[in-house]
Amino acid sequence: MKKSLLLFFVLINCLNALTFEEVYTIQKNEGSMKALSGYKQLAQENDPKAIHELAIIYLTGDEIAKNINKAHELFKKASELGNADSTYFLAKIYLSDKTIYFDEKKAYNTFVDAANQNNAKAQLMIGRFFLMGGIVPKDYEKALHYFKLASKQKEYDANCYIAYMYASGTGVFPNFGRANTFAKDEYEKGNKLCVKVWNDYNLGKYPKDEGFRIGDYNEPVK
């Protein structure tokens, strides 16, 4: 009799279980508090997307108290389960000197892990590290490589950095026309970084790329 009841309740729970997509829809339509129990249930089942969303809720304090420690724990768990977005957020926590987890070396290594998982935002960050130096020595060739990887995934801030490198001749031969090509769309959208590069180097005067078409990425993905 007891076994029958146990099997009955297990069956009921299975029938009532929500998918990640269903819980995510609840969150978007009714708020994070309504979705919390669903995410927690899925997290117990090691659903990496649910664990990631739960971590975001704790990180931002979306309808609950902020809890950086819980967010860190959850991002780490989801990252270990292969969620590249969680790996990126984990790296951001390590990069913040406002947390007890601040560790620039660990931040860099974790961003690299996320970049290797094809996370575009992490690729952008690694590009910035190599462009600016500090955490790692400056390496303009690597910076451009990572900016291009991010740009190919439509991480549009990367186009502004590529434009800057071509306009300033940082690590590449100066090419104002190519800088124009990479900056133009984001400049027109009001992206502050691209606006600065556009104005600083007067890129409106150079509408055509007159340079040699070397390499496989001479204009941005739209």
Language model: regions and residue ranges:
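Short helix-capping/linker turns of helical repeat alpha-solenoids
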Residues: 31, 44-47, 60-62, 81-83, ...
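Terminal, low-structured helical/coil segments at or just beyond the last alpha-helical repeat
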Residues: 174, 178-222
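Alpha-helical adaptor scaffolds
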Residues: 85, 89-99, 105, 109-116, ...
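Hydrophobic face of amphipathic alpha-helices that form TPR/SEL1-like repeat modules
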Residues: 22, 26, 53-60, 64, ...
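N-terminal leader/linker segments that initiate helical-solenoid repeat arrays
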Residues: 15-53, 214, 222
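Sec-dependent N-terminal signal peptides
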Residues: 4-13
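Structural signature of tandem alpha-helical TPR/SEL1-like repeats
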Residues: 28-37, 65-74, 100-110, 137-146, ...
